Curated annotation (Swiss-Prot):
<keyword id="KW-0235">DNA replication</keyword>
<dbReference type="GO" id="GO:0033260">
    <property type="term" value="P:nuclear DNA replication"/>
</dbReference>
<dbReference type="GO" id="GO:0043596">
    <property type="term" value="C:nuclear replication fork"/>
</dbReference>
<dbReference type="Pfam" id="PF25005">
    <property type="entry name" value="PSF2_N"/>
</dbReference>
<feature type="compositionally biased region" description="Basic and acidic residues">
    <location>
        <begin position="197"/>
        <end position="206"/>
    </location>
</feature>
<dbReference type="InterPro" id="IPR021151">
    <property type="entry name" value="GINS_A"/>
</dbReference>
<dbReference type="InterPro" id="IPR056784">
    <property type="entry name" value="PSF2_N"/>
</dbReference>
<dbReference type="GO" id="GO:0000785">
    <property type="term" value="C:chromatin"/>
</dbReference>
<comment type="subunit">
    <text>Component of the GINS complex which is a heterotetramer of SLD5, PSF1, PSF2 and PSF3.</text>
</comment>
<dbReference type="GO" id="GO:0007059">
    <property type="term" value="P:chromosome segregation"/>
</dbReference>
<dbReference type="Pfam" id="PF05916">
    <property type="entry name" value="Sld5"/>
</dbReference>
<comment type="function">
    <text>The GINS complex plays an essential role in the initiation of DNA replication. Has a role in chromosome segregation.</text>
</comment>
<dbReference type="InterPro" id="IPR036224">
    <property type="entry name" value="GINS_bundle-like_dom_sf"/>
</dbReference>
<comment type="similarity">
    <text>Belongs to the GINS2/PSF2 family.</text>
</comment>
<dbReference type="GO" id="GO:0071162">
    <property type="term" value="C:CMG complex"/>
</dbReference>
<dbReference type="InterPro" id="IPR007257">
    <property type="entry name" value="GINS_Psf2"/>
</dbReference>
<feature type="region of interest" description="Disordered">
    <location>
        <begin position="182"/>
        <end position="206"/>
    </location>
</feature>
Length: 206
């Protein structure tokens, strides 16, 4: 299957989500379970009410079977996210530090483990959306300061970079073409000046 042009140079949303699901998260098992050997990962022996870290995708499966509760990451709460939002407002040229997959993990937990979150989900969704929007505005403003060789995207998450990448590549290609065009004109101008100097030298000798 041929991907649309805007997706050929970036990951699909499902691929970004897949990568996020492989990160580890803490769970609180409701029952004891024997160790599992899976392709590419292992699930340690689980004991009831004893915290353990496992991949998010496994935690979601166990959660759906009522076999565990998911312990939310320290950053997934209203106080922390509001602080980050304030940081974004105070630092117009810098992004606040957030986990690499904060958007995807937030989405997964809000959809699959809402009852394990300490704050109302509608408030969490609201502040996450506000945070995402202000970071998007800042990143687009930052594109105005692009040059043809690099762009500074420190602090952005994988999903945020992935969403910007097609546009960034297009802009950088245009800037590179413009840069090359200016250099070509400059080289031609230098060549003409040298020809003029040679002409004057010949005239003086005559």
């Amino acid at each position: 299957m041929v991907l649309p042009a805007h997706l050929q140079n970036s990951l699909m949303p499902s691929e970004v989500s897949f990568l996020a699901e492989n990160e580890y998260i803490t769970i609180l098992p409701r029952y004891s379970m024997k160790k599992l050997e899976l392709i590419g990962t292992k699930v340690p022996t689980l004991r009831g009410m004893r915290r353990e870290k496992i991949p998010i995708w496994i935690a979601v499966i166990l959660k759906s079977q009522d076999k565990c509760n998911i312990v939310p990451p320290e950053w997934l709460n209203l106080i922390y996210l509001k602080e980050k939002y304030e940081e974004e407002l105070k630092q117009p040229h810098k992004f606040s530090v957030l986990p690499w997959n904060w958007l995807e993990i937030s989405k997964i937990l809000l959809n699959k483990a809402a009852d394990d979150l300490s704050d109302p989900t509608h408030q969490l969704r609201s502040i996450i959306q506000d945070l995402r929007e202000i970071r998007l505005v800042k990143s687009r403003k930052g594109l105005k300061e692009l040059n043809e060789s690099n762009i500074q995207l420190d602090g952005l998450s994988l999903l945020e970079i992935n969403e910007l990448r097609p546009f960034v590549l297009t802009v950088m290609n245009k800037l590179r073409q413009l840069h090359e065009s200016v250099n070509t004109k400059t080289d031609r101008g230098t060549g003409n000046d040298q020809d003029d100097d040679m002409y004057h030298d010949v005239s003086d000798n005559e």
